[in-house]
Amino acid sequence: WLTGLFLALLALFMMTGARAFLAWPMYESLLSTLPLYGFLALGLTLVVAAGEMDLCFPSTLAVAGFGFALTGIHTGQVWLGVIVAILIGLGIGLCNGFLVAYVGVPSIIATIGTQFFWRGAVMLLSQGLALGLADLGGSPMHSVLAGRLGGFLPMQSLWLIVMALALWLLLNRHPLGDAIRFTGEQADIASRLGINVPAARLGVHTLMGGIAGFAGAIGCMEMGSWWPTQGDGYMLLVFAAVFIGG
């Protein structure tokens, strides 16, 4: 019924505000910005499926974006910056997963703490200053990840579809997906069935970090800059996408 309500409202807006709602630039704007939330929501879905929580991803996105920006500025290589951003995200996610799976800190507490730590760290390292990345806009990798297909369709919207399909297959057609869901539903029984519960928890947090790192790089490429508060305000919308959108 939510889909029906959305379509009804969209039809109403199109009839009453045709100049705005029938113009492609508005939808191009949506398709260029909403994938960032979508990437994060996909990663968080796996974390929640494992019975865990991650509140660190906005800060992970900012730190990874900072790594992407510095790498791009100093080397001029967008592809290398993307790799650095993903590796930074994986590292932060690995730390979160280790705290949760092997130290025994509840995930909500662990990731709240690491969120503040990494946000403070990136503020300190950047001295609160933004970084301009306009010179990276013409590279082939930029065109592949955040360019415009046919001059109008944002590439990140296509990458969101690719990631959604890949993670759906992982969760529903792969033994790792079974381990994640069993861990989330009943960890004790999953352990008795031979599932490595700590490894499953470590894996989802690490993957969430890597996805946040990728989103950080995409965000920098789309905006043409990095800013210290990157990721602020994302948490509520991402949680809404996961828990309300299902």
Stretches found by the model and what they are:
Residues 8-74, 98-105, 243-246:
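Single transmembrane alpha-helix segments in multi-pass membrane proteins
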Residues 4-16, 160-167:
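Hydrophobic core of alpha-helical transmembrane segments in multi-pass integral membrane proteins
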Residues 3-4, 30, 37-38, 59-63, ...:
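Hydrophobic alpha-helical transmembrane segments
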Residues 36-37, 65-66, 113-122, 192-194:
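Small-residue-rich segments of transmembrane alpha-helices in multi-pass membrane proteins
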Residues 43-44, 85-93, 165, 236-246:
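Hydrophobic alpha-helical transmembrane segments of polytopic membrane proteins
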Residues 103, 107-174, 200-203, 222-231:
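Transmembrane helix-bundle core of multi-pass membrane transporters
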Residues 77-85, 91-96, 149-226:
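Helix-loop-helix "hairpin" substructures at the membrane interface of multi-pass membrane proteins
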